[in-house]
């Protein structure tokens, strides 16, 4: 990049698009004003300075609005409607102001220089190193964040730390955002993504291309093209990704076809083939582990019936788009269960899985060194509604900790047929699999079930405090035994 300090940590700042009526006054965002100005300065004026002039402008501030003197600053810099202005607070009511055109190039640049740097042919985006493309998915809309290619991030210094940026649509409307990098090497744009998609009418399945405008003092990712999901020609990125994933899974696909045509002679697979389909399917409801843990527990009977414990330390998950994820298969002694690690979170995000969803896998091939499990969206969603009734969210209050009492919903008790468990000791499992006995009582005044003696100790064990919510999963296969709840996650409210 031309400016190596472009992505360095920024001073407190805010940005404003110039709307009709901007010449007489401009507002400082309330949040910024409250945090950096209110109560900290007695002065009634601010000082503005721009890169295009050595002069300093004094502007009156009334509340959080700049008034007298602002018009002179506007006229001196020839600011116009739809231009974009960044205010960087340097302290003591002093601001460095960067005036940008509607395209976010510095307005002080010569028109000829701008024309020489703007790409006009959409075909150039694929080879332009200042561009990157991404697809709109259910999961990235839900998280209000979208990934940034690693090579792009590394090229422009986004692969280290956090960097404040601006997301901008094709019409020049801006949203404040930031680029965040993680130790794993993953880089995302966090914030503003959902709003940009809504404003630009981008839907799930669409692809879009962003161009980095690195002539501005604050990095700008501007939307420069949209590829609708309809039509095969409009999805070159999707095709390329499927082809890349298919290369990894093609050998597994060939093995599946061979098994279907010839049958598998091995004893282990003849045993698994006797099942009617349920034996070859793995269904798990893991709302607590989708985002809070990377591990994914696997039922022991499934793992044993399909022979996955013999010599296999890896499994491969494949979705309906032929993309694969390789996970490490391990055994947890404390819970006496198998689990997988290494790609579960990525798998959930890519396939739009949310807390409370059920996940159904079908064993496609177990005769290879690395077993292959096929994920079905349709089957997973059909099972999701039923299994969500097994999850219970409880909010802990100071009184519930003090009295060691926490009420359960009547609907949850009724749906799961727990009425006869009142007055008995049930078991709560913490995140390490340790058992905590807790009394389940019936409060006759409110005709409701309540967790009693032992609750306080369990809350201390899982580290939940007052005003936090805890998600529990009912682990109860038959009504002849006492109910058991497994701790999933805690939610700060």
From Swiss-Prot:
GO terms for cellular component: nucleus. Residues 272-281 have a biased composition (Polar residues). Residues 247-267 have a biased composition (Basic and acidic residues). One of its GO terms (molecular function) is DNA binding. CDD domains: B3_DNA (cd10017). Keywords: DNA-binding, Nucleus, Repeat, Transcription, Transcription regulation. Residues 11-103, 131-226, 281-378, 391-490 bind DNA. Coiled coil: none annotated. It comes from the Eukaryota. The keyword Electron transport does not apply. Residues 238-281 are annotated as: Disordered. Its main location: nucleus. It is found in: Nucleus. InterPro entries: B3_DNA-bd, DNA-bd_pseudobarrel_sf, REM_fam. This is B3 domain-containing protein REM6. It comes from Arabidopsis thaliana. The gene is REM6.
């Amino acid at each position: 990049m031309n400016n190596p300090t472009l992505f360095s940590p920024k001073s407190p700042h805010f940005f404003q698009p110039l709307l009709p009526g901007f010449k007489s006054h401009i507002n400082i965002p309330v949040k910024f004003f409250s945090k950096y100005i209110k109560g900290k300065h007695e002065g009634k004026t601010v000082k503005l300075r721009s890169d295009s002039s050595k002069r300093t402008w004094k502007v009156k501030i009334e509340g959080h609005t700049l008034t007298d003197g602002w018009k002179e600053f506007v006229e001196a810099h020839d600011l116009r409607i739809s231009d974009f202005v960044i205010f960087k607070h340097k302290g003591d009511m002093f601001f460095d102001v960067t005036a940008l055109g509607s395209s976010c190039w510095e307005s002080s640049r010569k028109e000829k220089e701008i024309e020489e740097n703007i790409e006009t042919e959409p075909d150039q985006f694929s080879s332009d190193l200042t561009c990157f493309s991404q697809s709109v998915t259910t999961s990235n809309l839900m998280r209000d964040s979208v990934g940034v290619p690693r090579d792009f991030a590394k090229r422009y210094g986004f692969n280290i730390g956090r960097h404040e940026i601006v997301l901008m649509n094709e019409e020049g409307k801006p949203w404040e955002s930031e680029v965040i990098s993680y130790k794993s090497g993953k880089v995302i744009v966090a914030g503003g993504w959902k709003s940009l998609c809504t404003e630009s009418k981008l839907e799930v399945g669409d692809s879009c291309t962003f161009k980095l405008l690195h002539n501005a003092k604050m990095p700008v990712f501007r939307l420069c093209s949209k590829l609708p999901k309809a039509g095969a020609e409009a999805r070159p990125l999707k095709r390329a990704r499927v082809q890349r994933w298919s290369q990894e899974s093609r050998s597994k696909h060939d093995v599946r076809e061979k098994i279907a045509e010839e049958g598998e002679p091995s004893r282990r697979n003849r045993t698994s083939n006797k099942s009617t389909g349920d034996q070859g399917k793995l269904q798990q409801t893991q709302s607590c582990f989708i985002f809070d843990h990377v591990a994914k527990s696997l039922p022991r009977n499934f793992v044993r019936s399909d022979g996955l414990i013999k010599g296999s330390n890896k499994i491969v998950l494949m979705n309906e788009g032929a993309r694969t994820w390789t996970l490490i298969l391990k055994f947890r002694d404390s819970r006496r269960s198998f689990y997988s690690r290494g790609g579960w979170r990525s798998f959930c995000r890519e396939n739009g899985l949310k807390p409370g969803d059920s996940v159904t896998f079908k064993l496609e091939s177990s005769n290879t060194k690395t077993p292959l499990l096929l994920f079905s969206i349709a089957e997973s969603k059909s099972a999701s509604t039923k299994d969500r009734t097994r999850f219970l969210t409880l909010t802990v209050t100071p009184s519930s900790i003090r009295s060691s009492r926490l009420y359960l919903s009547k609907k949850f008790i009724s749906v799961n047929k727990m009425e006869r468990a009142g007055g008995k000791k049930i078991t709560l499992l913490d995140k390490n699999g340790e058992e905590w006995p807790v009394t389940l009582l019936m409060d006759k005044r409110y005709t409701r079930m309540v967790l009693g003696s032992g609750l306080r100790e369990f809350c201390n064990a899982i580290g939940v405090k007052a005003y936090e919510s805890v998600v529990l999963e009912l682990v109860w296969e038959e009504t002849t035994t006492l109910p058991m709840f497994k701790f999933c996650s805690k939610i700060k409210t």
